[in-house]
């Protein structure tokens, strides 16, 4: 707020929609990049390309997140299963059948909020 009010730029690590700030990650992903804040708003800084091993590591988290967003937009239950199956931690400890069962239990537990998911 101080940077906005005083127009003295302040640098933070901000979470923003990628929009090409990190070239080798999906543009629709949320990424953390350096940002300058001033009276005119938040100004993300282009980072360029990450070393491929780091980009690959990031994509293991980004891919299930993008599928979860698609599931929310389309109300497609199978996309929820797919997102959970691609999650590195979930896939590391549960079988496919256990993942489907867990997702079904969570969807059922949220009742009215998730009633449209087919």
Language-model segment annotations:
Residues 1-118:
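Long, compositionally biased stretches enriched for glycine and/or charged residues
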């Amino acid at each position: 707020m101080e940077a906005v009010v005083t127009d003295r730029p302040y640098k933070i690590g901000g979470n923003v929609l990628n929009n090409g700030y990190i070239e080798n990650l999906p543009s629709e992903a949320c990424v953390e990049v350096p940002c300058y804040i001033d009276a005119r708003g938040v100004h993300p800084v282009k980072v360029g390309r990450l070393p491929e091993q780091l980009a690959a590591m990031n994509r293991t988290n980004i891919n299930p997140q993008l599928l979860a967003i698609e599931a929310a937009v389309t109300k497609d239950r199978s996309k929820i299963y797919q997102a959970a199956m691609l999650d590195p931690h979930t896939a590391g400890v549960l079988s496919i059948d256990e993942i489907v069962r867990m997702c079904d239990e969570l969807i059922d537990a949220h009742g009215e909020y998730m009633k449209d998911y087919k």
